[in-house]
């Protein structure tokens, strides 16, 4: 039997079981747990390679073969870190297994035929497209920035750069919901809209859900009173949609105890649960320990660095329409920015108490940095806290699974869309991101949307090959014309579907129906289920979880940073 060195094999077909891969310039390493391919029967495309007629490519009709195969991919997802071929059919993940020609090769369950396209994923990492669940729809160009960072789904609200949208993630009322759904129909990204949840009577909330809102957002700038919270959650329970909340920083209508009492045992998604982005000062972070609270962070506080506090004060004044010449506005801003709770947030993420990360796009958050900042936190926490059991000093598989779940499967489950997106699993939309390991979490090599390339780095268009400088991200055919409608999804609630809303608005995209929002609890947050008793000292702002003081020094240097953005 012929033999090949492990290094030569990895160079040719990518890493296999037992091989370790470093994630960009972080301190994080993953180890391949399983290889679905068969040694000696691997498929690869190119001159003199395997995927040729009668060899790795069979004679079957298109109905019996894949539309697209990603060969020899290293999949990193919440369920595992594995080597496999990925078969895509009709824009969805059809098979994760062994590609080739079943007429001449054993163990093939990803058939390659004359109607099959190939993407060479040898030496590449494949992850699910990110789900950003805190979007202010301030400008449509956010979509390009997000796609270029590896995010393929938006949940949020807004109507453009209106004063209300600059501060709150709400698309208020049926008219604006209709217009934004029509606008979203042309954007090459999955979208679900949040309506305004601040009302003390239910009819206006039911009206918005019937008009297409997949969730409701309670925001202190509209008045997050106990009455509004109770009313909003009552409607959510009735109509199976999610509620997101930005609580009362000033504690005017009640403190955190009053908010938790108004919520009761009903499921709710708490935005920027640390508090710098808004919420009961100084102790909204306590909510992360509740079984019915699904806590997320927005990315400006991630990770805690020597510049975090200074940057936040200026951001806050702009986003919430505050006046630096008014003492009360300055006091409001300063009450929200606390070093101690920001530092504790990173640790609570590492412990699995905070379940999600998101952006807060252009409203105290950066839409293109959800993925990047999530992994910066993971890196910092490995340096500060060492390996997470059962990891070793040489492999960080569990930590990697915990952190990737924060911006993929967990926000998808939270908002009732986990059956369509959020992971690399059979049956889901083929929203996939390819990364070279050296550029992981920073600059994708390709982004697939519904099985079609939607954006990619591309060189000189007049070049004789695709790679000459200048290379920068450009929209691809998946983002153009009617192809967008076949590869993107608009999410709607069942109430809107029952009214025939998609037909009434002439929406041409795929439609996904949110469901199961009210059943999701903290134990359902993949790899992020911890429910510690969190305490905050009202004078010093020190944070304890189950009695342990949570402190860490701010970072002065980070990976995934300047060395990647010189050009």
UniProtKB/Swiss-Prot annotation:
Residues 129-567 form the Urease domain. Substrate binds at residue 219. One of its GO terms (cellular component) is cytoplasm. Pathway: Nitrogen metabolism; urea degradation; CO(2) and NH(3) from urea (urease route): step 1/1. GO terms for molecular function: nickel cation binding; urease activity. It comes from Pseudomonas putida (strain ATCC 700007 / DSM 6899 / JCM 31910 / BCRC 17059 / LMG 24140 / F1). Belongs to the metallo-dependent hydrolases superfamily. Urease alpha subunit family. Keywords: Cytoplasm, Hydrolase, Metal-binding, Nickel. Its EC number is 3.5.1.5. The modification N6-carboxylysine is found at residue 217. It is found in: Cytoplasm. Ni(2+) 1 binds at residues 134, 136, 217, 360. Carboxylation allows a single lysine to coordinate two nickel ions. Its cofactor is Ni cation. Ni(2+) 2 binds at residues 217, 246, 272. Pfam families: Amidohydro_1, Urease_alpha. This is Urease subunit alpha. Coiled coil: none annotated. NCBIfam families: PRK13206.1, PRK13207.1, urease_alph. InterPro entries: Amidohydro-rel (IPR006680), Metal-dep_hydrolase_composite (IPR011059), Metal_Hydrolase (IPR032466), Urease_alpha_N_dom (IPR011612), Urease_alpha_subunit (IPR050112), Urease_AS (IPR017950), Urease_asu (IPR005848), Urease_asu_c (IPR017951). The keyword Hydrolase applies. It is an enzyme of class 3 (hydrolase). One of its GO terms (biological process) is urea catabolic process. The active site is at residue 320. It catalyses: urea + 2 H2O + H(+) = hydrogencarbonate + 2 NH4(+).
